[in-house]
């Protein structure tokens, strides 16, 4: 009898047969499961953030019984809007200003009860449309007679520095003047706190546009007829360091919007400013 030769394979025959079966099974195409009911098959109205935000403001304005308690109306773009947001919805881990907003303007003194009417992406022309009376074709967001604020806190114009109209300083300034005039026409008893534009992380934009616009609106607020109902609040130095550059510790990574610390600093400046305006 011839001696059996040991196999060089580490696997026994049954194991090899099983592995071969698995290999065949894996190489056999799996029939596709037919899926139905895709979103792509059905009509869907496109809804952007600004539309939802505008609807939310309109809903607050429809609550006429609550409007007499509003002493401050904040009007502007995303820099104003995001003061009442918590975590950045677009970038995880970044915080906006909800805590300081609640502390100062919701849970604070009744004289500082506020309505935030900022909408992300707004340019001066968009604010003009929102506050234009409904009878004139606008949204009428200052129409309600029950809304009778002591102050309207305004910051607008930075979005006009992108996709700008040239000459850019003149166009941004003209837009701010138009908003200022329209706000006063709608709420003539309110004092308007005209805030400076904040620095961006673009030093060229700051030097060529933001700083010159701020100088012009500061001068505007000091001259009649605007001085009778407008006061200028210069926030630019608060948000810059000793070299004049943007204080990055006060901004999220996009270099435009304040972070939680920036909003706290803004609140800590605005509240004493309001007190001084009430008690000159």
Named regions from a protein language model:
Residues 32-120, 125-147:
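Serine-esterase "nucleophile elbow" of acetyl-processing enzymes
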Residues 168-178, 209-214:
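Charged helix-capping and loop-helix junction motifs
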Residues 71-76, 113-118, 150-156, 160, ...:
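Structural recognition of the beta-strand scaffold that forms the well-ordered cores
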Residues 1-12:
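N-terminal secretory signal peptides that target proteins for export/translocation
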Residues 199-280:
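Catalytic His-Asp segment of secreted/periplasmic serine-dependent ester chemistry enzymes
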Residues 114-119, 123, 157-172, 200-206:
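Surface-exposed cleft-lining segments at the edges of enzyme active sites
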Residues 14-25:
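Bacterial N-terminal signal peptides
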Residues 153-161, 180-213, 236-242:
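Active-site segments of SGNH/GDSL-like serine hydrolases
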């Amino acid at each position: 009898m011839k001696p059996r030769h040991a196999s060089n394979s580490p696997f026994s025959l049954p194991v090899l047969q099983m592995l071969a079966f698995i290999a065949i099974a894996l190489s056999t195409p799996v029939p596709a499961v037919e899926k139905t009911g895709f979103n792509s098959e059905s009509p869907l109205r496109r809804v952007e953030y600004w539309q939802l935000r505008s609807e939310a403001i309109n809903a607050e304005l429809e609550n006429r019984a609550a409007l007499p308690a509003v002493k401050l109306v904040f009007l502007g773009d995303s820099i104003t809007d995001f003061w009442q947001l918590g975590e950045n919805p677009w970038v995880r881990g970044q915080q906006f200003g909800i805590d300081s907003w609640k502390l100062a303007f919701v849970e604070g003194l009744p004289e500082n009860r506020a309505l935030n009417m900022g909408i992300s992406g707004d340019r001066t022309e968009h604010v003009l449309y929102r506050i234009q009376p409904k009878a004139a074709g606008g949204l009428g967001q200052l129409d309600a007679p029950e809304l009778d604020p002591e102050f309207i806190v305004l910051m607008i114009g930075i979005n006009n520095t992108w996709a700008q109209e040239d000459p850019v300083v003149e166009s941004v300034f003209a837009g701010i003047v138009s908003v200022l005039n329209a706000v006063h026409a709608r709420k003539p008893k309110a004092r308007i706190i005209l805030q400076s534009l904040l620095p961006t992380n673009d030093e060229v934009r700051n030097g060529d546009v933001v700083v010159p616009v701020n100088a012009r609106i500061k001068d505007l607020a000091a001259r009649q007829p605007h001085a009778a109902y407008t006061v200028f609040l210069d926030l630019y130095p608060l948000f810059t360091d000793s070299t004049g550059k943007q204080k990055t510790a006060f901004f999220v990574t996009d270099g435009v919007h304040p972070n939680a610390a920036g909003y706290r600093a803004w609140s800590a400046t605005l509240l004493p400013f309001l007190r001084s305006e009430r008690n000159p």
